[in-house]
Amino acid sequence: HEPEAQKGLNALTALMMGRGGTASMSYEELTERLNPWSASISAQFDKEMTVLVGEVHRDHLDPFVTILRDLIVTPGFDEADFARNREFLTNSVVSTLRGTDDEELGKETLNALLYAEHPYGVPVNGTEDGLAAIELDDVRAFHAAHYTKGNVIVGVAGGYPDGFVERVELEIVSLLPNGDASPMALPTVSTLDGREVLLVDKDAIATAISIGFPIDVTRADDDFYALMVANSYFGEHRTFNGLLMNKMRGQRGLNYGDYSYIENFIQDGGSRLPVTNIPRRQQLFSIWIRPVPHHNAHFALRQAIRELEVLVNEGLTETEFDASREFLLNYSKLYVQTTSRRLGYHMDSAVYGTAYFIDEIQRRLPSLTVTDVNDAIRRHLQSENLAIAIVTSDAEAFR
């Protein structure tokens, strides 16, 4: 819903609540109030969902809810908060993404190539020009238009008292304005024609590579669970269960790691686990080749594509299937080690219209067969039409 010329408006609006004050309390006063309670309020934003996350000990629940209510319903929209948060987002794009984080730049380059003329094609933090074009009144208007009753999902977990959920509905949700709750229609993702490459030339010490293509599968589809097994075998994030990791790092020592994904993936802090609450109606299959020395970049790209070709053409053996399914049945239990993560997956399941995702993994995977997995691979994965994003020095020579 962001205007084309104001990319970053959603992120900036979210930060005015997650890193801002209320109409009656400055951000500094709010922080001083929360710190003695060991409480926190933060904002997480993606293309289709923004989440305001609050955590507090139950002894301080009553005053905490009042602060949370005021942040959501009547944000302060303070000029100093606006300037600080816009500068934070601008620095994240200019200094971090473009300046020092070649891995993320490679992923965003893949998005730009894969999702041209599409809302997913721009970084969630916005663009330098888009952020510069945003005024405080634009943030106020965006908040009024989209933070409405029909757009809200409330999730509560932990040791809360009886009637607390109803209280949140009454004291927070009911105070929001009415509004259009229908999601924006998404354009069809452009069809790839062969292997399309986008090179970014910068003074990088190594070459970062991301590969991907759109898939018509989300957690709402039965085939998602079969693809979970296939993906765990092929490229489970930051584990040696994945074939890519074993062959490219383990056997050849090309780089730190090589992984694959069947949906948009953001790592949760320093863990190996995915962030919750970033559901999308359109998903992609992707391969992340972490930076490799320039002289090995061509080889790493060719090997990753070759391994994908083998996966598509040959699938998994019975032994590979059994081992990967068993690994995933156990590993997925680690997804919900905290109350916050359990709540996050419950909310994601509500968005996708499914039963609780973690329970579904335990229910569905035991009944899968190797034929189910290989059939799903043939239906949804391929190696001929690929978007390939490369961040490297002397890009012209890479051609």
Question: Which residue stretches match the model-derived regions?
Answer:
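A short, acidic, amphipathic alpha-helical segment used as a generic capping/interface helix at domain edges
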Residues: 368-375
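Short, conserved charged micro-motifs
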Residues: 62-63, 162-166, 221, 294-299, ...
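PPIase-associated folding chaperone regions across multiple families
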Residues: 222-230, 244
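Short, surface-exposed beta-strand/loop micro-motifs that present aromatic residues
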Residues: 140-145, 194-201, 274-277, 376-379
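An aromatic/glycine/proline-enriched structural segment found at the starts
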Residues: 116, 153-217, 236, 392-399
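M16 family metallopeptidases and their MPP-like homologs
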Residues: 1-18, 22-73, 92, 102-129, ...
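Non-catalytic, conformational "gating/processing" segments within enzyme and secreted inhibitor domains
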Residues: 91, 95, 107-108, 136-171, ...
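Short, conserved secondary-structure transition motifs
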Residues: 56-57, 89-96, 187-201, 326-335
